[in-house]
């Protein structure tokens, strides 16, 4: 065999082994990737976010903006999002809006209204958030995560 052939074959063999290893690790990496967040964790995170909002109020939340009150018994995540999505220019509730959209099975857009709104009653965003927080804490204690 030619003396230069051995190092060349060795280098090609190592490159093939390295490429095989990279491909195998890439394929197996999908098995270790995180799955969907359990509903209990998502609800706990939403509760924590609402606690942060209510505790860190130095000025009126969202400049005292008003939202439609909602029925907190059924389909409340989408109804809450529908109310809050109509508040513009309030960075304090943006994370809450994103979190609520994770609980709502359909896309919600501004101006959309559900039958779950109590259409004759508007309340301040701060009171809305407090009411929602109390209700979510109750659901969490009762183990109702969906």
Curated annotation (Swiss-Prot):
Glycan-carrying positions: 52, 63, 71, 86
Example of a GO cellular component annotation carried by this entry: extracellular region
Primary localization: secreted
Gene3D superfamilies per UniProt: 1.20.1250.10
Compartments in which it is found: Secreted
Keywords of the record: Cytokine, Disulfide bond, Glycoprotein, Secreted, Signal
Residues making up the signal peptide according to the UniProt record: 1-24
Disulphide linkage map: 62-90, 78-104
A Pfam family matched in the record: IL13
Family according to the record: Belongs to the IL-4/IL-13 family.
Annotated disease: Allergic rhinitis: A common disease with complex inheritance characterized by mucosal inflammation caused by allergen exposure.
Function according to Swiss-Prot or TrEMBL: Cytokine that plays important roles in allergic inflammation and immune response to parasite infection. Synergizes with IL2 in regulating interferon-gamma synthesis. Stimulates B-cell proliferation, and activation of eosinophils, basophils, and mast cells. Plays an important role in controlling IL33 activity by modulating the production of transmembrane and soluble forms of interleukin-1 receptor-like 1/IL1RL1.
Subunit note: Interacts with IL13RA2.
Protein name, per record: Interleukin-13
Lineage start: Eukaryota, Metazoa, Chordata, Craniata, Vertebrata
